[in-house]
Amino acid sequence: MYKKIVFILLFLSFVIDAGAQNTVSSPYSKYGIGDNVGFTNTINASMGGIYNALRRNNFVNHRNPASYTAIDTQSFVFDIGYYSNNIILQSNSAVSKGNTGGISHILFAFPLSKTLKMAGGILPVSVIDFSAAESFPKDSIIGSHKFIYDGEGGINKVMLGIAYQPSFFDKLSVGLNAEYLFGNYYRSSTLTFPDSANMLSSRVEYNYSISAINFNFGLQYQQNLNNGDAIVIGANYVLPSHLPTQNQYRHYTFTYNAAVETVKDSVKYENTEGSIELPQSFGVGLSYERKNKFLIGLDFGYTQWSEFALQGIRYPEILKDNYTFNAGAEYKPDIYGNYLEKIAYRFGVNYQTGMLSLYNTDISQLGVSLGFGLPIKKQGTQVNIYLEYGKQGTKENNLIREDYFRVGVSFSAKDRWFFKRKYQ
Protein backbone atom coordinates (compact mmCIF):
# COMPACT_ATOMS: atom_id res chain seq x y z
CA MET A 1 0.00 0.00 0.00
CA TYR A 2 2.60 2.53 1.08
CA LYS A 3 4.83 1.71 -1.89
CA LYS A 4 1.96 2.67 -4.18
CA ILE A 5 1.43 5.98 -2.38
CA VAL A 6 5.14 6.81 -2.59
CA PHE A 7 5.08 5.98 -6.31
CA ILE A 8 2.19 8.40 -6.88
CA LEU A 9 3.98 11.19 -4.99
CA LEU A 10 7.17 10.64 -7.01
CA PHE A 11 5.17 10.61 -10.21
CA LEU A 12 3.61 13.96 -9.31
CA SER A 13 7.02 15.49 -8.65
CA PHE A 14 8.20 14.50 -12.13
CA VAL A 15 5.18 15.98 -13.89
CA ILE A 16 5.01 19.34 -12.13
CA ASP A 17 6.36 21.13 -15.18
CA ALA A 18 3.92 19.34 -17.47
CA GLY A 19 1.02 20.06 -15.15
CA ALA A 20 1.93 23.74 -15.17
CA GLN A 21 1.69 24.17 -18.93
CA ASN A 22 -0.31 27.14 -20.17
CA THR A 23 -3.96 26.21 -20.39
CA VAL A 24 -5.42 29.59 -21.32
CA SER A 25 -4.25 32.36 -23.62
CA SER A 26 -6.17 35.60 -23.21
CA PRO A 27 -5.35 39.30 -23.56
CA TYR A 28 -7.10 39.83 -20.23
CA SER A 29 -4.37 37.81 -18.51
CA LYS A 30 -2.47 41.12 -18.35
CA TYR A 31 -4.37 42.01 -15.18
CA GLY A 32 -4.16 40.67 -11.62
CA ILE A 33 -2.33 37.34 -11.45
CA GLY A 34 -3.41 36.44 -14.97
CA ASP A 35 -6.34 34.57 -16.40
CA ASN A 36 -7.85 32.50 -13.62
CA VAL A 37 -8.08 28.82 -14.49
CA GLY A 38 -11.72 28.45 -13.49
CA PHE A 39 -12.23 24.74 -14.04
CA THR A 40 -11.85 22.26 -11.21
CA ASN A 41 -11.63 18.95 -13.03
CA THR A 42 -13.41 17.44 -16.00
CA ILE A 43 -16.42 16.16 -14.04
CA ASN A 44 -17.06 19.46 -12.26
CA ALA A 45 -16.47 21.50 -15.41
CA SER A 46 -18.95 19.47 -17.46
CA MET A 47 -21.65 20.32 -14.89
CA GLY A 48 -21.14 24.08 -15.09
CA GLY A 49 -18.36 24.13 -12.51
CA ILE A 50 -20.45 23.15 -9.47
CA TYR A 51 -18.39 21.80 -6.58
CA ASN A 52 -19.54 23.03 -3.16
CA ALA A 53 -22.21 20.37 -2.60
CA LEU A 54 -20.79 17.62 -4.82
CA ARG A 55 -19.77 14.31 -3.18
CA ARG A 56 -18.50 11.29 -5.10
CA ASN A 57 -16.48 8.19 -4.22
CA ASN A 58 -14.69 7.91 -7.58
CA PHE A 59 -13.13 11.34 -8.17
CA VAL A 60 -11.40 14.07 -6.17
CA ASN A 61 -13.45 17.26 -5.72
CA HIS A 62 -10.51 19.34 -4.47
CA ARG A 63 -12.32 22.71 -4.45
CA ASN A 64 -14.25 21.60 -1.35
CA PRO A 65 -11.98 19.44 0.84
CA ALA A 66 -14.91 18.28 2.97
CA SER A 67 -15.96 16.09 0.02
CA TYR A 68 -13.00 13.73 0.56
CA THR A 69 -15.00 11.84 3.20
CA ALA A 70 -17.09 10.37 0.35
CA ILE A 71 -14.06 8.23 -0.63
CA ASP A 72 -14.54 4.56 0.28
CA THR A 73 -12.56 3.27 3.25
CA GLN A 74 -10.82 0.59 1.14
CA SER A 75 -10.19 2.58 -2.05
CA PHE A 76 -7.46 4.65 -3.63
CA VAL A 77 -8.72 7.21 -6.18
CA PHE A 78 -6.53 8.69 -8.92
CA ASP A 79 -7.63 11.34 -11.42
CA ILE A 80 -5.59 12.87 -14.27
CA GLY A 81 -6.86 15.18 -17.00
CA TYR A 82 -5.82 17.10 -20.09
CA TYR A 83 -7.63 19.81 -21.99
CA SER A 84 -7.33 22.01 -25.04
CA ASN A 85 -8.57 25.59 -25.34
CA ASN A 86 -9.40 27.00 -28.77
CA ILE A 87 -10.02 30.75 -28.83
CA ILE A 88 -11.13 33.41 -31.29
CA LEU A 89 -10.22 36.99 -30.35
CA GLN A 90 -12.27 39.72 -32.02
CA SER A 91 -11.90 43.49 -31.92
CA ASN A 92 -13.58 46.08 -34.14
CA SER A 93 -10.64 45.91 -36.55
CA ALA A 94 -9.10 42.43 -36.36
CA VAL A 95 -9.69 38.74 -35.67
CA SER A 96 -7.12 36.22 -34.45
CA LYS A 97 -7.21 32.57 -33.39
CA GLY A 98 -5.20 30.47 -31.00
CA ASN A 99 -4.98 27.08 -29.37
CA THR A 100 -3.30 26.08 -26.13
CA GLY A 101 -3.54 23.09 -23.83
CA GLY A 102 -1.92 21.09 -21.10
CA ILE A 103 -2.47 18.88 -18.09
CA SER A 104 -5.44 20.28 -16.19
CA HIS A 105 -5.08 18.29 -12.97
CA ILE A 106 -3.41 15.35 -11.29
CA LEU A 107 -5.24 14.36 -8.10
CA PHE A 108 -5.42 11.42 -5.72
CA ALA A 109 -7.25 10.50 -2.50
CA PHE A 110 -7.19 7.66 0.01
CA PRO A 111 -8.51 6.83 3.51
CA LEU A 112 -6.51 7.18 6.71
CA SER A 113 -9.35 5.67 8.73
CA LYS A 114 -13.11 5.24 8.48
CA THR A 115 -13.67 8.88 9.47
CA LEU A 116 -10.48 10.50 8.15
CA LYS A 117 -9.57 10.84 4.45
CA MET A 118 -6.65 12.50 2.66
CA ALA A 119 -6.15 13.94 -0.84
CA GLY A 120 -3.41 15.66 -2.81
CA GLY A 121 -2.38 16.78 -6.26
CA ILE A 122 -1.10 19.48 -8.57
CA LEU A 123 -2.92 21.84 -10.90
CA PRO A 124 -2.68 25.34 -12.40
CA VAL A 125 -4.21 28.38 -10.69
CA SER A 126 -3.69 31.12 -13.27
CA VAL A 127 -1.96 31.74 -16.60
CA ILE A 128 -0.32 34.91 -17.91
CA ASP A 129 0.13 35.07 -21.67
CA PHE A 130 -0.37 38.36 -23.50
CA SER A 131 1.23 40.56 -26.13
CA ALA A 132 -0.05 43.95 -27.23
CA ALA A 133 1.29 46.88 -29.24
CA GLU A 134 0.39 50.54 -29.53
CA SER A 135 1.72 52.64 -32.44
CA PHE A 136 1.94 56.42 -32.66
CA PRO A 137 2.38 58.42 -35.88
CA LYS A 138 5.42 60.49 -36.71
CA ASP A 139 5.70 63.90 -35.01
CA SER A 140 8.20 66.76 -35.07
CA ILE A 141 9.96 65.77 -31.83
CA ILE A 142 10.67 62.05 -31.73
CA GLY A 143 9.16 60.69 -34.94
CA SER A 144 6.97 57.60 -35.10
CA HIS A 145 7.25 55.25 -32.16
CA LYS A 146 5.72 52.06 -30.84
CA PHE A 147 5.03 50.62 -27.39
CA ILE A 148 5.02 46.82 -26.99
CA TYR A 149 3.68 45.10 -23.86
CA ASP A 150 4.44 41.42 -23.20
CA GLY A 151 3.82 39.03 -20.33
CA GLU A 152 4.01 35.34 -19.55
CA GLY A 153 4.01 32.94 -16.62
CA GLY A 154 1.42 31.93 -14.08
CA ILE A 155 0.77 30.38 -10.69
CA ASN A 156 0.40 26.67 -9.93
CA LYS A 157 -0.31 24.81 -6.74
CA VAL A 158 0.57 21.56 -5.04
CA MET A 159 -2.08 20.69 -2.48
CA LEU A 160 -2.51 18.26 0.38
CA GLY A 161 -5.86 18.02 2.10
CA ILE A 162 -7.59 16.18 4.90
CA ALA A 163 -11.27 15.67 5.74
CA TYR A 164 -13.07 14.42 8.84
CA GLN A 165 -16.54 12.94 9.24
CA PRO A 166 -17.29 12.43 12.95
CA SER A 167 -18.87 9.07 13.75
CA PHE A 168 -21.19 10.68 16.30
CA PHE A 169 -22.60 13.09 13.65
CA ASP A 170 -21.91 11.56 10.25
CA LYS A 171 -24.14 13.98 8.36
CA LEU A 172 -21.40 16.60 8.68
CA SER A 173 -17.98 16.64 7.01
CA VAL A 174 -15.25 19.24 7.40
CA GLY A 175 -12.03 19.56 5.43
CA LEU A 176 -8.86 21.57 4.99
CA ASN A 177 -6.44 21.97 2.08
CA ALA A 178 -2.90 23.26 2.58
CA GLU A 179 -1.82 24.64 -0.79
CA TYR A 180 1.71 25.51 -1.85
CA LEU A 181 1.51 28.24 -4.49
CA PHE A 182 4.47 28.76 -6.79
CA GLY A 183 5.23 30.36 -10.14
CA ASN A 184 6.76 33.20 -12.10
CA TYR A 185 5.38 36.40 -13.58
CA TYR A 186 7.36 38.15 -16.32
CA ARG A 187 6.24 41.36 -17.98
CA SER A 188 7.98 43.95 -20.12
CA SER A 189 7.33 47.33 -21.74
CA THR A 190 9.33 48.19 -24.86
CA LEU A 191 9.64 51.52 -26.71
CA THR A 192 10.92 51.35 -30.30
CA PHE A 193 11.43 53.88 -33.11
CA PRO A 194 10.78 52.03 -36.38
CA ASP A 195 11.68 54.94 -38.69
CA SER A 196 14.81 56.19 -36.95
CA ALA A 197 18.11 54.31 -36.95
CA ASN A 198 19.66 56.93 -34.66
CA MET A 199 17.20 56.53 -31.77
CA LEU A 200 17.89 53.93 -29.09
CA SER A 201 15.03 51.65 -28.19
CA SER A 202 14.48 50.85 -24.52
CA ARG A 203 12.91 48.06 -22.50
CA VAL A 204 11.81 47.71 -18.88
CA GLU A 205 11.51 44.14 -17.55
CA TYR A 206 9.95 42.85 -14.33
CA ASN A 207 10.33 39.25 -13.20
CA TYR A 208 8.57 38.07 -10.04
CA SER A 209 9.19 34.64 -8.46
CA ILE A 210 6.31 33.52 -6.23
CA SER A 211 6.28 30.99 -3.38
CA ALA A 212 3.79 30.77 -0.49
CA ILE A 213 1.34 28.61 1.49
CA ASN A 214 -2.43 29.11 1.46
CA PHE A 215 -5.40 27.38 3.11
CA ASN A 216 -8.84 26.35 1.87
CA PHE A 217 -11.57 25.31 4.33
CA GLY A 218 -14.61 23.23 3.38
CA LEU A 219 -17.84 22.02 4.94
CA GLN A 220 -20.62 19.72 3.74
CA TYR A 221 -23.87 18.58 5.34
CA GLN A 222 -25.72 15.61 3.84
CA GLN A 223 -29.33 14.82 4.68
CA ASN A 224 -30.46 11.39 3.49
CA LEU A 225 -34.16 11.10 2.71
CA ASN A 226 -36.43 8.12 3.30
CA ASN A 227 -36.53 7.16 -0.39
CA GLY A 228 -32.74 7.00 -0.65
CA ASP A 229 -32.35 10.47 -2.14
CA ALA A 230 -29.91 12.93 -0.59
CA ILE A 231 -29.66 16.69 -0.20
CA VAL A 232 -26.20 18.18 0.32
CA ILE A 233 -25.36 21.71 1.43
CA GLY A 234 -21.74 22.77 1.01
CA ALA A 235 -19.52 25.77 1.58
CA ASN A 236 -15.86 26.67 1.27
CA TYR A 237 -13.65 29.57 2.26
CA VAL A 238 -10.19 30.47 0.93
CA LEU A 239 -8.10 32.73 3.14
CA PRO A 240 -6.53 35.90 1.74
CA SER A 241 -2.91 35.19 0.82
CA HIS A 242 0.29 37.15 1.25
CA LEU A 243 2.66 35.86 -1.44
CA PRO A 244 6.28 36.96 -0.92
CA THR A 245 8.06 37.60 -4.22
CA GLN A 246 11.66 37.84 -5.33
CA ASN A 247 11.78 40.66 -7.86
CA GLN A 248 14.20 41.38 -10.67
CA TYR A 249 14.04 44.77 -12.36
CA ARG A 250 16.02 45.60 -15.48
CA HIS A 251 15.99 48.72 -17.67
CA TYR A 252 18.24 48.81 -20.73
CA THR A 253 18.61 50.37 -24.17
CA PHE A 254 19.21 48.53 -27.43
CA THR A 255 19.34 48.90 -31.18
CA TYR A 256 17.09 46.93 -33.46
CA ASN A 257 18.23 46.08 -36.96
CA ALA A 258 17.08 43.30 -39.30
CA ALA A 259 15.21 41.53 -36.47
CA VAL A 260 18.37 41.47 -34.33
CA GLU A 261 18.57 43.25 -30.97
CA THR A 262 21.90 44.57 -29.70
CA VAL A 263 22.02 45.76 -26.09
CA LYS A 264 23.78 49.12 -25.77
CA ASP A 265 23.54 50.06 -22.11
CA SER A 266 21.97 48.90 -18.84
CA VAL A 267 20.25 51.89 -17.29
CA LYS A 268 19.25 50.12 -14.09
CA TYR A 269 19.34 46.60 -12.64
CA GLU A 270 18.24 45.60 -9.16
CA ASN A 271 16.97 42.68 -7.06
CA THR A 272 14.34 43.41 -4.43
CA GLU A 273 11.74 41.66 -2.30
CA GLY A 274 8.03 42.35 -2.56
CA SER A 275 4.64 40.71 -2.33
CA ILE A 276 1.38 39.90 -4.05
CA GLU A 277 -1.81 40.05 -2.02
CA LEU A 278 -4.44 37.55 -3.14
CA PRO A 279 -8.03 38.17 -1.99
CA GLN A 280 -10.31 36.00 0.09
CA SER A 281 -13.08 34.01 -1.56
CA PHE A 282 -16.02 31.91 -0.46
CA GLY A 283 -18.71 29.80 -2.05
CA VAL A 284 -21.93 27.99 -1.13
CA GLY A 285 -23.82 25.27 -2.95
CA LEU A 286 -26.83 22.97 -2.86
CA SER A 287 -27.37 19.62 -4.59
CA TYR A 288 -30.13 17.05 -4.80
CA GLU A 289 -29.27 13.50 -5.84
CA ARG A 290 -31.16 10.31 -6.54
CA LYS A 291 -28.53 7.60 -6.21
CA ASN A 292 -27.42 6.03 -9.49
CA LYS A 293 -29.99 8.12 -11.40
CA PHE A 294 -29.60 11.91 -11.43
CA LEU A 295 -28.10 14.91 -9.66
CA ILE A 296 -28.79 18.63 -9.90
CA GLY A 297 -26.74 21.36 -8.23
CA LEU A 298 -26.43 25.11 -7.79
CA ASP A 299 -23.39 27.13 -6.70
CA PHE A 300 -22.68 30.75 -5.83
CA GLY A 301 -19.20 32.19 -5.34
CA TYR A 302 -17.54 35.48 -4.44
CA THR A 303 -13.93 36.64 -4.74
CA GLN A 304 -12.84 40.03 -3.37
CA TRP A 305 -10.54 41.07 -6.24
CA SER A 306 -10.83 44.73 -5.24
CA GLU A 307 -8.36 43.87 -2.44
CA PHE A 308 -5.71 42.48 -4.79
CA ALA A 309 -2.34 44.25 -4.58
CA LEU A 310 0.85 43.88 -6.64
CA GLN A 311 3.98 45.14 -4.88
CA GLY A 312 1.82 47.17 -2.50
CA ILE A 313 -0.27 48.83 -5.22
CA ARG A 314 -4.02 48.28 -5.54
CA TYR A 315 -5.99 48.85 -8.74
CA PRO A 316 -9.53 49.87 -7.72
CA GLU A 317 -10.22 51.53 -11.07
CA ILE A 318 -9.63 48.21 -12.90
CA LEU A 319 -10.18 45.29 -10.50
CA LYS A 320 -13.56 44.65 -8.91
CA ASP A 321 -15.19 41.90 -6.89
CA ASN A 322 -16.24 38.86 -8.92
CA TYR A 323 -19.50 36.95 -8.44
CA THR A 324 -19.99 33.50 -9.98
CA PHE A 325 -23.19 31.53 -10.58
CA ASN A 326 -23.09 27.85 -11.57
CA ALA A 327 -25.78 25.29 -12.31
CA GLY A 328 -25.34 21.71 -13.45
CA ALA A 329 -26.88 18.27 -13.67
CA GLU A 330 -26.01 14.64 -14.31
CA TYR A 331 -28.28 11.87 -15.57
CA LYS A 332 -27.69 8.10 -15.71
CA PRO A 333 -30.47 6.28 -17.60
CA ASP A 334 -29.86 2.80 -16.15
CA ILE A 335 -26.62 1.65 -14.52
CA TYR A 336 -27.69 -1.98 -15.09
CA GLY A 337 -28.75 -1.50 -18.72
CA ASN A 338 -26.80 -1.57 -21.97
CA TYR A 339 -23.63 0.48 -22.38
CA LEU A 340 -25.34 3.67 -23.64
CA GLU A 341 -27.68 3.55 -20.64
CA LYS A 342 -24.73 3.25 -18.24
CA ILE A 343 -23.11 6.47 -19.52
CA ALA A 344 -23.37 9.51 -17.23
CA TYR A 345 -24.69 12.50 -19.23
CA ARG A 346 -23.74 15.89 -17.80
CA PHE A 347 -24.53 19.50 -18.66
CA GLY A 348 -24.29 22.91 -17.04
CA VAL A 349 -24.03 26.67 -17.32
CA ASN A 350 -21.77 29.18 -15.60
CA TYR A 351 -21.71 32.97 -15.41
CA GLN A 352 -19.20 35.40 -13.91
CA THR A 353 -19.68 39.13 -13.46
CA GLY A 354 -15.91 39.34 -13.96
CA MET A 355 -13.00 40.82 -12.01
CA LEU A 356 -12.21 43.50 -14.61
CA SER A 357 -13.76 46.84 -15.49
CA LEU A 358 -12.05 48.51 -18.45
CA TYR A 359 -13.23 51.83 -19.91
CA ASN A 360 -16.29 51.59 -17.62
CA THR A 361 -17.16 48.21 -19.15
CA ASP A 362 -17.39 45.02 -17.11
CA ILE A 363 -15.58 42.01 -18.62
CA SER A 364 -18.12 39.30 -17.84
CA GLN A 365 -18.04 35.64 -18.87
CA LEU A 366 -20.75 33.14 -19.83
CA GLY A 367 -20.29 29.46 -20.69
CA VAL A 368 -22.35 26.33 -21.35
CA SER A 369 -20.93 22.84 -20.94
CA LEU A 370 -21.66 19.23 -21.82
CA GLY A 371 -19.97 16.05 -20.68
CA PHE A 372 -20.01 12.27 -20.62
CA GLY A 373 -18.80 9.73 -18.09
CA LEU A 374 -17.85 6.58 -19.98
CA PRO A 375 -17.59 3.57 -17.65
CA ILE A 376 -15.00 0.91 -18.27
CA LYS A 377 -15.08 -2.64 -16.98
CA LYS A 378 -13.66 -1.97 -13.56
CA GLN A 379 -16.31 -0.63 -11.18
CA GLY A 380 -15.90 3.06 -10.35
CA THR A 381 -13.42 3.73 -13.16
CA GLN A 382 -14.37 6.18 -15.92
CA VAL A 383 -13.12 8.09 -18.91
CA ASN A 384 -14.69 11.56 -18.72
CA ILE A 385 -15.16 13.92 -21.67
CA TYR A 386 -15.99 17.59 -21.32
CA LEU A 387 -16.99 20.24 -23.88
CA GLU A 388 -17.59 23.92 -23.19
CA TYR A 389 -18.40 26.92 -25.32
CA GLY A 390 -18.28 30.40 -23.85
CA LYS A 391 -17.45 34.04 -24.34
CA GLN A 392 -15.63 36.67 -22.33
CA GLY A 393 -15.53 40.41 -22.86
CA THR A 394 -17.01 42.60 -25.57
CA LYS A 395 -16.03 44.56 -28.68
CA GLU A 396 -17.55 47.73 -27.25
CA ASN A 397 -15.27 50.64 -26.29
CA ASN A 398 -12.40 49.19 -28.38
CA LEU A 399 -12.17 46.10 -26.19
CA ILE A 400 -11.76 42.45 -27.21
CA ARG A 401 -14.34 39.70 -27.25
CA GLU A 402 -13.01 36.21 -26.63
CA ASP A 403 -14.96 33.17 -27.81
CA TYR A 404 -13.57 29.90 -26.50
CA PHE A 405 -14.21 26.22 -27.09
CA ARG A 406 -12.68 23.86 -24.55
CA VAL A 407 -12.33 20.11 -24.79
CA GLY A 408 -11.22 18.08 -21.80
CA VAL A 409 -10.53 14.40 -21.20
CA SER A 410 -9.77 12.78 -17.86
CA PHE A 411 -9.27 9.32 -16.47
CA SER A 412 -10.55 8.63 -12.96
CA ALA A 413 -9.73 5.28 -11.40
CA LYS A 414 -10.85 3.74 -8.13
CA ASP A 415 -8.84 0.76 -6.91
CA ARG A 416 -9.15 -1.37 -3.77
CA TRP A 417 -5.86 -1.03 -1.91
CA PHE A 418 -6.75 -0.99 1.75
CA PHE A 419 -8.07 -4.42 2.63
CA LYS A 420 -6.63 -7.67 3.88
CA ARG A 421 -6.86 -10.77 1.76
CA LYS A 422 -8.08 -13.92 3.49
CA TYR A 423 -5.99 -16.12 1.21
CA GLN A 424 -2.58 -15.47 -0.33
Give, region by region, the residue ranges found by the protein language model.
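Sec/Tat signal peptide C-region and signal peptidase I cleavage site
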Residues: 16-20
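Subset of outer-membrane beta-barrel
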Residues: 21-424
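Sec-dependent N-terminal signal peptides
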Residues: 5-14
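N-terminal secretory signal peptides that target proteins for export/translocation
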Residues: 1-2
